Amino acid sequence: GSDIHRYALLGPYVPGTVWGHEFSGEVVAVGKNVTKVKVGQKVTACPALYCGKCDSCKKAKFAQCENLGVIGQHHQGAFAEYIVMEEENVVPVPENVSYDAAAMVEPSCVVAHGYYKVNLDPGDTVAVVGCGTIGLLAIQWAKIFGASKVIAIDIDDAKLELAKKLGADETINSRNKEPFEEVHKVNGGKGVDVAVESAGTPITSAQTFSLADKGGRVLFVGIPYGDVMVKRLYFEKIVRNELKVYGSWNAISAPFPGKEWTSTVHFISNGQLKMDPLITHRLPLSKGVEA
């Protein structure tokens, strides 16, 4: 998704650069100074490239690096048979984790990064707006963090059915029902503790403000590629309900690449994060354009 939308359409894509920033593979060669990564290891890798020199990097806030790069942007990406990565970006993967699942580690880390920012607590109620890959991972992560109730919101019944299988306690089709009213109906007349926007559309970005309870938290992990027009009622919720609004970008923290990566690999390995249901097609590299 973001390879096309972010880098090619709106981002700083350099013509001739190979796309792809979510991947897994086997190490086939290492440099002479590499000590922690071995030939033959199954791995994935963090695609983010921080500069290490700006004020944010000096504070170990790598996700806020002023010169942050990503493979597939200015640097050759992973839609290829081989890719070269720095040792510190490489994340080993246990043998019981498939290559398919390992390729999904990065988007899972995006979700984990956001939840670590909002300090999701056991017993919290959570609404997830948008049940694409990020949203379905957000539902699973909410349960891992101990959420007492997870409400999935989308306009696609098939996605909502999958959300239910992956842990959502309630589902709402926002094409047919008003999310604000339905969330309050299924949550005891209240908003949720944490409202997550993962659809990345102007409409859902505006709606999400209305779903959080008084003093609640609103987490944005989706990026709307258009202007967001917020209704007065929704915007007033921020002020009158003293909401805390969090933007979450990327999937890295200190020590680099961050606990998002180690925790994701752990929960995939023990079966709490399920990746196979999110995979719909498997195509060879030769059919990359078709994909």
Task: Identify the role of each PLM range.
Residues 8-55, 91-96:
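Glycine-rich beta-strand-centered segment in the early N-terminal region that forms part
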Residues 44-45, 127, 219:
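Hydrophobic beta-strand signal
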Residues 49-129, 160:
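NAD(P)H dinucleotide-binding glycine-rich loop of Rossmann-like/cofactor-binding domains
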Residues 97-177, 181:
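Mid-domain Rossmann-like dinucleotide-binding core that forms the NAD(H)/NADP(H) cofactor-binding site
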Residues 118-120, 161, 165-244:
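Glycine-rich cofactor phosphate-binding loops and adjacent beta1-alpha1 units
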Residues 177, 206-210, 214, 259-291:
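C-terminal hydrophobic helical "lid"/dimerization subdomain
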Residues 217, 232-277:
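Rossmann-fold dehydrogenase core element
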